[in-house]
C-alpha cells in the first residue's frame, strides 16, 4: 500500500496539477463530470487522483470494519437494490474477481442521481461514475470503490 500511495497516487496528483496549471480552480465534482471531454491528461490523472483519494477514505482496520453496520437508510437501499447485504457483497466480489472486468479499472457501488437505488458498475482505467459518459446509467455517486488494476 505504501508504494501504491507514495508512488502511484503521488504521480496522479503531480500530473493533474501539471495538466490544470494556469486554469481556474473548479470543484472536484465539476472536474470529474467534464474529465472525459477535457482529454486524457485530465481524465487519467484527475480520475486516478479522485479514485485513490476516495479509496483511502473508505479504508478502515479490519477490526473496525467488521463492527461497522450500514445506516438504516443505506440498509434500505441495499435491500431494495440487492436483496440483502450478503447478496450485495457477493455481487461486488464477483464483479471484482480477477478477469471479471476486462483490462484494468475499478468496481463501484453507487447511488443513482435520484438517491433511490444502488448500482454495481465497473469502469475502465481511472474512469469513475462521476464522469459524464463513463457508465451507462449516467452520472452516479460512488459509495464504495475498489481498485482492480493488476498492481492493486
Residue ranges and their predicted role:
Residues 1-152:
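Feature for soluble, non-membrane regions of globular proteins
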